[in-house]
């Protein structure tokens, strides 16, 4: 079984709610425009990845990389989280990210 599964996510979320992390602010990650992703990855690479996303089930790009129908959303949100975190620090709304 691949390590990416709903139970793993729940374990991470449970761990982040433990005492050492309770003071951290949490924000919903926005879905970033893929044009911003193309600022750090070649457009052909982004296009190839997007085209590899299955309509159903899973696709293994390599032994460690599994894609499912919601992989694009996950990619856009994880990238969006990074951009949002930097924006908050640069705006002075956060001291670190």
Predicted regions and their residues:
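HDAC/HDAC-like amidohydrolase catalytic core signature
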Residues: 1-97
């Amino acid at each position: 079984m691949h390590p990416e599964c709903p139970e793993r996510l729940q374990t991470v979320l449970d761990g982040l709610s433990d005492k050492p992390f309770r003071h951290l602010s949490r924000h919903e990650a926005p879905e970033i425009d893929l044009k911003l992703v193309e600022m750090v990855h070649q457009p052909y690479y982004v296009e190839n990845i997007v085209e590899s996303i299955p309509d159903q089930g899973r696709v293994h790009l390599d032994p460690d990389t599994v894609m499912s129908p919601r992989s694009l959303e996950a990619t856009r949100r994880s990238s969006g989280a990074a951009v949002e975190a930097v924006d908050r620090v640069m705006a002075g709304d956060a001291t670190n990210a």
